[in-house]
């Protein structure tokens, strides 16, 4: 006999997985002892943070349209009266107050959160009994995956959603391994803070519930700990719940609109294909991980996690969820797959599969890095996207195809729009400037005007789109309204004494609605903005 790299013994001639007798019997064993944290894995965690710092310094792109919305929500912060979970707005105001409103400062938040995602993936591999090889392979699979690279560059709740899902998985892994009830408390914290970030944490909660009912853990409901975890989650996430109650559950309208305009186009084939394309070798590792969690005797105490992964996959398929919704489960499955490879007892086979998986993961990751880190300028990025030929990488939520990935297209042209509006505003007589109000057709345009307007000296910004409707019409009556993104013939809800097409802003790299954007000046409308607000109502995706 000999001892392998992870500290287990096995016969050199044995084919398959190294499973100790104590593991099969469920008795305490060496595998229950948490292996040491691999130094190389920690180096990879640090490398991820450094990569995002570098990308944030040298990026040729602006803020994403969604970031403008969350920054505006922070400016109009009303924690218990918000249509979206308030955590991003709170973070936005904290960043603005501590570090200033710079692109680098805001993007360091997802960079740190994304680094924490990678660290949690390593810790999960360790909790599953993974030694150095398993931890490093898990770290590689997450590090170069374009899904996790991109989410860690965008000031959005996506990376926070990934973080809290994974923290919940880590709590379940430790609960399975130790039986210590305190891990229920961490699960509750993950659910509660996750509810402050994104409502999709509810799908994780549903998947956990299904998994608990399908495993031996169903008996836990006879005790206090699961209920205490639920209570903690509800208390911590209560601002999100209270906001929905006070506003009449706008999330229902949001989801209905999202389903009609975007999710209806998501089919099973597309959903699965995207899981593969993010990391083809990683996908095989994830499939191995799911299988290992469900059927491998040595990991049978972690079967709960396997059912969480299966249940969440089924939920998103049934609800036609976007492909990235399942992203938080990938690190868990990478970890389980890496542990499975590490447990192969034939040394040469184990080495060949592990090194082969690592090489395949890194090779695809290097090729896909431009789709994860926004460092390549638009024109060469468009050429690269065309040369690669992966159409799903440049497909929008509406099924259209762009020269750039949609997230990249949504990071172009905003400052040009604000500067064009500023020129139109400054061309007005002083009396009209004193009365002027800016109107953005969608939350990206309104948010960009609101953000850059402070620097450019622009008047207040209003919009009926998304959360901006809740911010209200402001105090000015709107005797002069400068519309951004609205054609003159589309202004029908009010009648203007004069209507002037003052300018147009073109952006060949933007999404279709931002490529040729009109700027229209409306003078002496037949109603005040306050009357207009009460009459028209809002639209979340307008």
Residue spans for each PLM region:
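Transmembrane-lumen/periplasm boundary regions of multi-pass, lipid-linked membrane glycan transferases
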Residues: 202-302, 316, 370-374, 385-388, ...
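Transmembrane-helix motifs of polytopic, lipid-linked glycan transferases
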Residues: 108-129, 167
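Transmembrane-helix signature of polytopic, membrane-embedded enzymes
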Residues: 2, 20, 39-42, 121-144, ...
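Short acidic/glycine- and proline-prone juxtamembrane loop motifs at membrane-interface regions
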Residues: 147, 153-160
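Short hydrophobic alpha-helices at membrane interfaces in multi-pass membrane enzymes
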Residues: 174-192, 223, 227, 307
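Membrane-interface alpha helices of multi-pass inner-membrane proteins
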Residues: 76, 139, 183-198, 232-235, ...
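Short helix- or helix-capping micro-motifs
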Residues: 45-47, 138-143, 191, 195, ...
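Membrane-interface transmembrane helices that cradle and orient dolichyl/undecaprenyl
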Residues: 126-128, 168-184, 289-297
